[in-house]
Amino acid sequence: MSNQLFTTESGDKAAIGLSLTCALHCLMVPLLLALFPSGVLSSLGDERIHLGLLFLIIPISVFSLTFGCRVHRNLTLVAVGVTGICILIFSALLAHDMGGESLETAGTLLGSGIVALSHALNFKFSRSACIC
Protein backbone atom coordinates (compact mmCIF):
# COMPACT_ATOMS: atom_id res chain seq x y z
CA MET A 1 0.00 0.00 0.00
CA SER A 2 2.82 2.46 0.72
CA ASN A 3 4.10 2.17 -2.88
CA GLN A 4 0.62 3.09 -4.14
CA LEU A 5 0.56 6.04 -1.73
CA PHE A 6 3.96 7.18 -3.03
CA THR A 7 2.78 7.18 -6.65
CA THR A 8 -0.44 8.97 -5.72
CA GLU A 9 1.49 11.67 -3.84
CA SER A 10 3.93 12.10 -6.72
CA GLY A 11 1.07 12.42 -9.19
CA ASP A 12 -0.74 14.90 -6.96
CA LYS A 13 2.37 17.05 -6.61
CA ALA A 14 2.99 16.96 -10.38
CA ALA A 15 -0.63 17.86 -11.18
CA ILE A 16 -0.60 20.74 -8.68
CA GLY A 17 2.64 22.02 -10.20
CA LEU A 18 1.28 21.79 -13.74
CA SER A 19 -1.99 23.48 -12.76
CA LEU A 20 -0.10 26.34 -11.17
CA THR A 21 2.16 26.56 -14.23
CA CYS A 22 -0.94 26.85 -16.40
CA ALA A 23 -2.38 29.61 -14.20
CA LEU A 24 0.91 31.52 -14.06
CA HIS A 25 1.32 31.24 -17.82
CA CYS A 26 -2.16 32.64 -18.29
CA LEU A 27 -1.50 35.56 -15.95
CA MET A 28 2.11 36.39 -16.79
CA VAL A 29 2.26 36.11 -20.59
CA PRO A 30 0.05 39.14 -21.30
CA LEU A 31 2.06 41.18 -18.80
CA LEU A 32 5.40 40.07 -20.25
CA LEU A 33 4.24 40.73 -23.81
CA ALA A 34 3.10 44.22 -22.83
CA LEU A 35 6.38 45.00 -21.08
CA PHE A 36 8.70 43.36 -23.60
CA PRO A 37 7.02 43.27 -27.04
CA SER A 38 9.72 41.32 -28.84
CA GLY A 39 9.46 38.40 -31.23
CA VAL A 40 11.20 36.10 -28.76
CA LEU A 41 8.48 36.41 -26.13
CA SER A 42 5.61 36.15 -28.60
CA SER A 43 6.03 32.37 -28.71
CA LEU A 44 5.03 32.27 -25.02
CA GLY A 45 1.49 33.25 -26.03
CA ASP A 46 1.18 30.31 -28.41
CA GLU A 47 -1.94 28.21 -27.79
CA ARG A 48 0.11 25.04 -28.21
CA ILE A 49 1.51 25.67 -24.73
CA HIS A 50 -2.01 25.29 -23.29
CA LEU A 51 -2.54 22.08 -25.23
CA GLY A 52 0.85 20.74 -24.18
CA LEU A 53 0.07 21.39 -20.53
CA LEU A 54 -3.31 19.70 -20.96
CA PHE A 55 -1.68 16.63 -22.46
CA LEU A 56 0.41 16.41 -19.30
CA ILE A 57 -2.26 17.36 -16.76
CA ILE A 58 -4.99 14.99 -17.98
CA PRO A 59 -3.17 11.63 -17.69
CA ILE A 60 -1.39 12.60 -14.47
CA SER A 61 -4.67 13.73 -12.91
CA VAL A 62 -6.59 10.65 -14.01
CA PHE A 63 -3.82 8.39 -12.70
CA SER A 64 -3.40 10.17 -9.38
CA LEU A 65 -7.08 10.73 -8.61
CA THR A 66 -7.93 7.13 -9.54
CA PHE A 67 -5.26 5.65 -7.29
CA GLY A 68 -6.11 8.13 -4.52
CA CYS A 69 -9.76 7.13 -4.73
CA ARG A 70 -8.76 3.51 -4.20
CA VAL A 71 -7.20 4.57 -0.91
CA HIS A 72 -9.71 7.10 0.46
CA ARG A 73 -12.89 6.07 -1.45
CA ASN A 74 -14.04 9.67 -1.96
CA LEU A 75 -15.73 9.80 -5.37
CA THR A 76 -16.81 13.41 -4.86
CA LEU A 77 -13.17 14.44 -4.88
CA VAL A 78 -12.64 12.67 -8.20
CA ALA A 79 -15.72 14.43 -9.62
CA VAL A 80 -14.30 17.80 -8.52
CA GLY A 81 -10.99 17.01 -10.25
CA VAL A 82 -12.75 15.92 -13.44
CA THR A 83 -14.81 19.13 -13.37
CA GLY A 84 -11.61 21.18 -13.20
CA ILE A 85 -10.12 19.23 -16.09
CA CYS A 86 -13.27 19.77 -18.17
CA ILE A 87 -13.09 23.51 -17.50
CA LEU A 88 -9.43 23.52 -18.59
CA ILE A 89 -10.31 21.63 -21.79
CA PHE A 90 -13.15 24.06 -22.53
CA SER A 91 -10.87 27.03 -21.88
CA ALA A 92 -8.09 25.73 -24.11
CA LEU A 93 -10.29 24.65 -27.01
CA LEU A 94 -13.41 26.85 -27.08
CA ALA A 95 -13.37 29.76 -24.64
CA HIS A 96 -11.30 32.17 -26.72
CA ASP A 97 -13.59 31.82 -29.74
CA MET A 98 -16.77 32.04 -27.64
CA GLY A 99 -15.92 34.84 -25.22
CA GLY A 100 -12.51 36.21 -26.03
CA GLU A 101 -9.35 36.41 -24.01
CA SER A 102 -11.09 37.20 -20.74
CA LEU A 103 -13.27 34.07 -20.82
CA GLU A 104 -10.25 31.94 -21.70
CA THR A 105 -8.22 33.44 -18.86
CA ALA A 106 -11.05 33.16 -16.32
CA GLY A 107 -11.75 29.57 -17.31
CA THR A 108 -8.09 28.61 -17.16
CA LEU A 109 -7.66 30.16 -13.72
CA LEU A 110 -10.86 28.55 -12.42
CA GLY A 111 -10.04 25.13 -13.88
CA SER A 112 -6.43 25.25 -12.66
CA GLY A 113 -7.56 26.21 -9.18
CA ILE A 114 -10.09 23.39 -9.04
CA VAL A 115 -7.58 20.82 -10.31
CA ALA A 116 -4.94 21.99 -7.83
CA LEU A 117 -7.46 21.92 -4.96
CA SER A 118 -8.66 18.42 -5.88
CA HIS A 119 -5.08 17.13 -5.88
CA ALA A 120 -4.22 18.86 -2.60
CA LEU A 121 -7.27 17.20 -1.01
CA ASN A 122 -6.46 13.89 -2.72
CA PHE A 123 -2.96 14.09 -1.21
CA LYS A 124 -4.38 14.88 2.24
CA PHE A 125 -7.12 12.23 2.18
CA SER A 126 -4.78 9.55 0.84
CA ARG A 127 -2.32 10.19 3.66
CA SER A 128 -4.98 10.16 6.37
CA ALA A 129 -6.71 7.03 5.00
CA CYS A 130 -3.54 4.99 4.49
CA ILE A 131 -2.43 2.80 7.37
CA CYS A 132 1.02 1.98 6.03
Task: Describe the residue ranges of each PLM region.
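Secretory/periplasmic and organellar redox-cofactor proteins
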Residues: 1-13, 39, 43-132
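Functional transmembrane helices that embed catalytic/metal-coordinating motifs
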Residues: 14-37, 127
